[in-house]
Amino acid sequence: VLEFTRKICATNSDKVFHNSTYDVGWLTHHGVPINGRIIDTMIVAPLIDENQFWFSLNALGREYINEGKSEGELSAAAEEWGLDPKADMWRLPSAYVGTYATQDAALTLKLWNHFKILLEEQNLWNIFDLEMKVLPVVLAMKQQGVRVDVQRAESLKEELVRREKKIVQQIKKESGVTEVQLWAANSLAKVFDALELTYLRTPTGLPSFTKAFLENHSHPIAQMIREAREVNKTHSTFIDSILKHEHNGRIHAEIRQLKGESGGTVTGRLSMSNPNLQQVPARNKEIGPMIRSLFLPEEGEMWCSADFSQQEPRILTHYASRSRYDGAEAIADAYHAGDADFHQEVANLVGIDRKTAKTIGLGIMYGMGKGKLADQLGVSVDEASVILQKFNTYAPFVRQLADSVMRSAN
């Protein structure tokens, strides 16, 4: 079977898979290189309809061509042998597995032939070509993985746990509260009540301690809670995930091009899990470098971090000035004159600090409301409304473009 597969994969013809990450991973493991273009119907499906809930071969087969996989014979054989039909499939006799595999391949090809018609109808061939070019890169990234310093991760975990306990002890000492749960609002409410400090509440009246609220609070106890939470999240979410998923000193994270059953985005933005390497801490000047130092470049190589400078503001300014929205031309002129700082230019226009201008500007671009803005700035909703009104008065082009885009989308 392996030699037959090797001959098939050596040809330059298209190779059609459903969930190619799994199949190509095993083929690569067995030393079977793949020539020709790789086509993945599980990636094509969300191009055609990103609002589907299920993207398995069986679900898509029934949805589009009214044909699913018959697993009765495989399940009966597995039961007879006392095995799980999926997890232990490799232990079953080939007579049973072969029938299932043949059916699997045939359904994938039928689905692809149907998808070609839909790609044509929806004029999606250009985006299809793009995604299929990205696919081998994503597969190679997963297979290559990234080196991690496991020993350093383990020692850092211990260090951060000790640090968290020390901060929590200090919170207990300062407040007189004997039991403190960092992520339980009711527990933190007792700390604030003991110190006669006010705090936010949800619309239903429950205590609320958001990240922005704690960051903007002037009392030292709020900063202790914020720091303890950050330390806790760092070791319990990031470091634990690294230690759980590392294999022989490397991380091979799941990378999703589009939406699927296990995650992904409808916009086509890459997403990751096991672990999510896109959410490695960066903003904290102490913890950020600490966690990032756990990821090692290949021997003899070094890391390079590259990013577009103010990508969203530049695009916003381009379209706002082209549309002649109020105030956009001044920002466009600043860009043309040199390497302008969008948020500082807007801050100068409005008469607010750069951090506030950035929070509001990006917030409007992504549809943030008054409540979220108040939370981000650490002020009341009424105060946020006044700041937002001032922003829209002196930099109206941001809201004008956002509203225009929403009208087009609707």
Where are the language model's segments positioned?
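Short glycine-rich phosphate-binding loop at a beta-alpha junction
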Residues: 13-19, 179-181, 307
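Conserved "right-hand" nucleotidyltransferase catalytic core of DNA-directed polymerases
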Residues: 35, 52-55, 62-65, 70-287, ...
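Short, amphipathic alpha-helical "recognition" segments used to contact nucleic acids or chromatin
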Residues: 355-366
